[in-house]
Amino acid sequence: MTKENLENELKTLPNSAGVYQYFNQEGKLLYVGKAKNLKNRVKSYFAFTPNLHANPRNSLRIQKMIEETVHLEFITTNSEADALILENSFIKQLHPKYNILLRDDKTYPYIYVDFEEEFPRFEITRKLVKKSKIKYFGPFFKGARELLDALYLYYPLKQKASCKSPCIFYQISRCLAPCDKRISREKYLEILDEAMHALLNPSILIKNLEKQMLVLAQNENYEEAAKVRDQIVTIKDLEVKVEIDIAKLEDFEVFALAFENSMLSTLRFVVQNGKIISVNSKITPIKNDIQWDKNEIYKQLILENFSMDIPLLANVIYVYEEFEDRMLLEEILSQRFDKKISIKIPKIGEKRRICDLAFQNALLNIEKEQKNHDFTIQKELKSYFELENLPNDIEIFDNSHLQGVANVGAMVTYSANSWDKSKYRKFHLKHKNDYDQMREVLMRRALDFDKIPPPDLWLIDGGKALLDLAKEIIVSSGANVDILAISKEKIDAKAHRAKGGARDKIHSLKGEFSLSINDKKLQFLQKLRDEAHRFAISFHQNTKKKQDLNSSKLVNLGLSSGVIQKLLAYYGNFESIYKADFKDLAMLVGKKVAQKIKEN
């Protein structure tokens, strides 16, 4: 592909809304953008005389990107709003080199009350509850469970979803037995109203907890006192000290961005009844050679936090500063929720002051991050191995099996200088050799990029063959992910382990590297590999125990080892065997054997 081909492709652009994609010489996706008019928007990136080149009026980031571009593709849409939604989906799924990806795929809990119930109670949800008389509080970015426990401790509300007679909570004076009509609905709702007020004012709960902690300590019940102390610390963290009087009991949200020293900080305030009830902040390292795009960040931030499957608590959003697609986002959100949603930039007054406060906190978070986290090793890896991304988010893969038995794969995740165990993954595998097993694991992960965004780096436990395999899968996915592999040094075709430290080689797309065993880069990659290995081995051992147990059950039914292996080869695992359709089993191993399996 050449610049001449690109010039011809530019001539095919239509005058309609859509999404455009830029690719480099290797076919790697560089950038995804949206346009109201594809022809006008894409051509604005280029100058055409004397030859096709980057438009010097654009930023250095854009010029650098265009110099790398040799091919473009586009998808037309019915409207610019549709194009924006598709653009956001592509960025999240494919992680293009010149787009910034906010890595926050978590859903946060809400506390809610269902007033359709005769005696409503507090519950936790992460999704929209499809009922008409629901009151939501949140989202709570931490501490939701601690808040709920404190509410039930001090307000004698119904705790069990279904209860027909007084339960243990009534006996210990933690419930007034509404199930047995020992309290009227009117009186019960008065108590509930007090509890909801406390939920919006955590200092009320903290005072009660501090009294309880003191009593426990005086009674020398130090273990329980320590638990209450931890609960107090968590709830105190929820409180935001704001010297701004939000006079009206309003519900709204505030978003602010800050960028400094290659760090992007995003901050979100959730305000209910005039109180800031929760704060969420996120730090994203940005590649040094790429300038940040506030319009792109605000779009991602707001679209992700106002998705259709979570409750809408506020129809007004305040942002610290203007951004290009603000009005378009208003249109999208208003259509999404079938009501008017406003995105505003306040100029004066309390709303302006709270937006300024959000921005100041975003800057402070960058300072804290730089003091608490050292990204030196990531920068060294990027420079030494010529990676495209700063490897802040790393996924590490390993497989484990014993002579083709209990075949499993594992993925561990290292993010922002710590293990992110919420993103660890386990895989039951069908194949028996290392190469096909790794293909199976990597393919399954790549197919999930639309749900869990790709990382900056894949680290594979293996040699060049597995590195090339990973490259093939990443290229086919269209995602922008660097790849490294780590393998034992081989002597006479056998992996060599030196006493006092394994001799490891690092494989990259640029070549093979032998680093000193004292090299910090090698030690860091070994640490990552060892955690993946530990996780895979542990999963393999547990799987093997379960398989041995299940195998003994089938042996007790009179099945031979040959029949059991035949079933496993076909179904992959014992759970699938037990769930299999009788007809399918009968065709595979005969009716008598199938009947034994289904009856037991």
Swiss-Prot record:
Entry-linked InterPro entries: GIY-YIG_endonuc, GIY-YIG_endonuc_sf, GIY-YIG_UvrC_Cho, RuvA_2-like, UVR_dom, UVR_dom_sf, UvrABC_protein_C, UvrC
Disulfide bonds: none
Subcellular location, record wording: Cytoplasm
Kinase listed as a keyword: no
Presence of keyword Cytoplasm: yes
One GO cellular component, as annotated: cytoplasm
Pfam family, one: UvrC_RNaseH
GO MF term list: DNA binding; excinuclease ABC activity
Alphabetical UniProt keywords: Cytoplasm, DNA damage, DNA excision, DNA repair, Excision nuclease, SOS response
Top-level taxonomic group: Bacteria
GO biological process: nucleotide-excision repair; SOS response
Family to which this protein belongs: Belongs to the UvrC family.
Record text on subunit structure and interactions: Interacts with UvrB in an incision complex.
Role this protein plays: The UvrABC repair system catalyzes the recognition and processing of DNA lesions. UvrC both incises the 5' and 3' sides of the lesion. The N-terminal half is responsible for the 3' incision and the C-terminal half is responsible for the 5' incision.
PANTHER family in the record: UVRABC SYSTEM PROTEIN C, UVRC/OXIDOREDUCTASE
Identification of the protein by name: UvrABC system protein C
Species assigned in the record: Campylobacter jejuni subsp. jejuni serotype O:6 (strain 81116 / NCTC 11828)
